[in-house]
């Protein structure tokens, strides 16, 4: 039997009112790796807050002019996952794409529904990777940042989550 290698991550979690901050130990120092809010008093990037309209996200973040024509699918291409706001692939495709460049994309995640209109809630997600990469090409084990906005059926932001995923140590 092979022993599974697990990495112990030391975290400090602070919650105040409707805001949660997570600090993770990276190279001996605690670094902010997540912030999440369900409250209207917490401001995130581009001035966005819970309670704002989804239109404010569209106004604040880049999207391709024809984004509603860019469906994104599951890896096996059998299920519609949502729409690509910009970018041509998600992190699920990094293994096949093998890029040395920045990876930036935004998606509308239908959370299992077939469209925004049929979904009770959906998520707008923005993800960013930047070189240098451990192996020279972008991989899910490299560090990256992501911000996600939960949207209700009225087009209102109900939660905001920001994450920084630190580079995973190479298993050599």
Regions found by a protein language model. Name each.
Residues 31:
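Ligand-binding clamshell of periplasmic/extracellular solute-binding protein-like
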């Amino acid at each position: 039997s092979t022993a599974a290698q697990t990495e112990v991550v030391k975290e400090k979690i602070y919650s105040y009112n409707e805001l949660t901050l997570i600090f993770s130990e990276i190279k001996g120092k605690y670094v902010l790796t997540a912030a999440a809010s369900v409250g209207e008093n917490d401001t995130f990037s581009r001035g966005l807050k819970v309670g704002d309209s989804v239109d404010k996200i569209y106004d604040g973040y880049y999207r391709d002019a024809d984004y509603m024509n860019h469906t994104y699918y599951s890896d096996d291409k059998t299920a519609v996952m949502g729409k690509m706001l910009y970018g041509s692939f998600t992190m699920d495709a990094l293994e096949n794409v093998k890029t040395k460049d920045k990876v930036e994309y935004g998606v509308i995640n239908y959370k299992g529904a077939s469209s925004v209109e049929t979904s009770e809630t959906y998520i707008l997600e923005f993800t960013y990777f930047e070189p240098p990469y451990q192996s020279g090409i972008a991989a899910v084990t490299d560090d990256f940042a992501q911000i996600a906005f939960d949207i209700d059926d009225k087009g209102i932001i109900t939660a905001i989550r920001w994450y920084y995923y630190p580079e995973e140590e190479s298993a050599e």
